[in-house]
């Protein structure tokens, strides 16, 4: 005959087993250590540190023996890696916008380099693709620096045209 104390005891065991069933998969899925760090020049693959692949290549297959290099493969055309890495794919090469000229083509080890076309400059250094038309100095104001692909025109703040001096002189006389 099952008494109330037996049922109570069984429910405690059932509850304990239920909790274990819920938390054991979470516990075993956690990495062994949150501070698992590989030395410089290596990357983590599963629980093993592997030596990085050189620039221009990517990891086709990770190492099986710790601190050795896995299988590296050369980047495919149109892709690159600019430094030693543990990437599983190379990065896609960027494209130049319609208002830019290509300065250097993409290679396995470097991205394509673009610059603004003549008459345009980079408006925002954080976004090099943002080319804007160069400013033209007002008539009679000297140019201190010509516009180029990385900087806008710099105009002098002084007036050098004799007509402008005459205008300023007349303005002063009228004010007095």
Curated annotation (Swiss-Prot):
It is found in: Cell membrane. The keyword ATP-binding does not apply. The keyword Lipoprotein applies. This is Tumor necrosis factor receptor superfamily member 23. PANTHER family: TUMOR NECROSIS FACTOR RECEPTOR SUPERFAMILY MEMBER 10B (PTHR46330), TUMOR NECROSIS FACTOR RECEPTOR SUPERFAMILY MEMBER 22 (PTHR46330:SF16). Residues 156-176 form a propeptide. It is a lipid-anchor; GPI-anchor. Pfam families: TNFR_c6. Glycans are attached at residue 148. GO terms for cellular component: external side of plasma membrane. Disulfide bonds join 38-49, 50-63, 53-72, 75-90, 93-106, 96-114, 116-131, 134-147, 137-155. GO terms for biological process: negative regulation of extrinsic apoptotic signaling pathway via death domain receptors. TNFR-Cys repeats lie at residues 37-72, 74-114, 115-155. Keywords: Cell membrane, Disulfide bond, Glycoprotein, GPI-anchor, Lipoprotein, Membrane, Receptor, Repeat, Signal. Receptor for the cytotoxic ligand TRAIL. Lacks a cytoplasmic death domain and hence is not capable of inducing apoptosis. May protect cells against TRAIL mediated apoptosis through ligand competition. Cannot induce the NF-kappa-B pathway. PROSITE patterns: TNFR_NGFR_1, TNFR_NGFR_2. InterPro entries: TNFR/NGFR_Cys_rich_reg (IPR001368), TNFRSF10 (IPR052491), TNFRSF26_N (IPR034062). The gene is Tnfrsf23. Residues 1-29 form the signal peptide. A lipid is attached at residue 155 (GPI-anchor amidated cysteine). Ubiquitous.
């Amino acid at each position: 005959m099952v008494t109330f104390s037996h049922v109570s005891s069984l429910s405690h065991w059932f509850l304990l087993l239920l909790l274990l069933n819920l938390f054991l998969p979470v516990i075993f899925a956690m990495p062994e250590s949150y501070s698992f760090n590989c030395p410089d020049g290596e990357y983590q693959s599963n629980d093993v540190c592997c030596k990085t692949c050189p620039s221009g290549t990517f990891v086709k297959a990770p190492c099986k023996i710790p601190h050795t290099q896995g299988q590296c493969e050369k980047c495919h055309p149109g892709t690159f890696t600019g430094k030693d890495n543990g990437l599983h794919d190379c990065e896609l090469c960027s494209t130049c916008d319609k208002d830019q000229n290509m300065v250097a083509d993409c290679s396995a080890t470097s991205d394509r380099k673009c610059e603004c076309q003549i008459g345009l400059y980079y408006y925002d250094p954080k976004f090099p693709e943002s080319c804007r038309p160069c400013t033209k100095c007002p008539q009679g104001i000297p140019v201190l620096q010509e516009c180029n692909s990385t900087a806008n025109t710099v105009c002098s703040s002084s007036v050098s045209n004799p007509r402008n001096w005459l205008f300023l002189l007349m303005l002063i006389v009228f004010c007095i």
